Amino acid sequence: MARYFEDYKIGDRFTTPGRTVSEGALAIIEGLGGYCAPFMIDEEFAKATPLGGRIAPGRAVAFLMGGLVEMSDIFDLETVIALMGLNNIRFRSPLRAGDTIRVEMEITDMRETKNPERGLLIHKEICKNQRGEVVAEVEGTHLIKRKTRG
């Protein structure tokens, strides 16, 4: 069943399924993205840094968070028009190969648009690892179809 703008309310909370991030997935993301910082690709180098080992690029974390949200049933692909933006992204803890992450989302605001067929959903996403540590936080805005017309 399609979920429209009116089907959400401020304060709604959702949690995505978890995903274990493999070494292979990180290697593909790093390769495609052109990431080459030694602390991301050289384990021995990274062990000697305050990080204590290799970590995933922050932008890879945001990419994986988007995938988890996409795979969940938080948004209906029939009614989402576009992701309009991501704001105030913060990386709190490193993501490492073998970590399992999930995203907790809360609808924080809803705004009508000039177009009566669309509305904006503003939400906060928090990515946590298997230990409950916050890996990243971001505020997002999605443009969603409305049930009501004019």
Protein language model annotation of sequence segments:
Residues 1-84, 149-150:
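Hot-dog-fold acyl-thioester-processing enzymes
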Residues 3-10, 94-150:
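HotDog/MaoC-like acyl-thioester-processing domains
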Residues 67, 89, 106-108:
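Beta-hairpin (beta-strand-turn-beta-strand) motif
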Residues 86-95:
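Short, mixed-charge aromatic SLiMs
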Residues 84-87, 103:
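Short beta-strand or tight-loop elements
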